[in-house]
């Protein structure tokens, strides 16, 4: 029954693209929060002496 095969193919095709479209729209509508840099941290200024070449 090729009609049933075509019907299942069309159903899966449209369901797949519809789900991808819904996921893409949801991802586009989510707000991206801008995280500010953490200025309270300090960097370590001690030299790294582990890499000594003979």
Swiss-Prot record:
It is found in: Mitochondrion membrane. It is a single-pass membrane protein. One of its GO terms (cellular component) is mitochondrial membrane. Pfam families: ATP-synt_8 (PF00895). Coiled coil: none annotated. It comes from the Eukaryota. One of its GO terms (molecular function) is proton transmembrane transporter activity. GO terms for biological process: proton motive force-driven ATP synthesis. Keywords: ATP synthesis, CF(0), Hydrogen ion transport, Ion transport, Membrane, Mitochondrion, Transmembrane, Transmembrane helix, Transport. The keyword Metal-binding does not apply. Its main location: mitochondrion. The chain crosses the membrane at residues 8-28. InterPro entries: ATP8_metazoa. The keyword Cell cycle does not apply. F-type ATPases have 2 components, CF(1) - the catalytic core - and CF(0) - the membrane proton channel. Mitochondrial membrane ATP synthase (F(1)F(0) ATP synthase or Complex V) produces ATP from ADP in the presence of a proton gradient across the membrane which is generated by electron transport complexes of the respiratory chain. F-type ATPases consist of two structural domains, F(1) - containing the extramembraneous catalytic core and F(0) - containing the membrane proton channel, linked together by a central stalk and a peripheral stalk. During catalysis, ATP synthesis in the catalytic domain of F(1) is coupled via a rotary mechanism of the central stalk subunits to proton translocation. Belongs to the ATPase protein 8 family. This is ATP synthase protein 8. It comes from Patiria pectinifera (Starfish).
């Amino acid at each position: 029954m090729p009609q049933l095969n075509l019907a299942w193919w069309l159903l899966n095709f449209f369901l797949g693209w519809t789900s991808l479209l819904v996921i893409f729209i949801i991802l586009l509508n989510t707000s991206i929060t801008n995280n500010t840099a953490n200025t309270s941290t300090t960097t370590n200024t001690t030299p790294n002496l582990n890499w000594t070449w003979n």
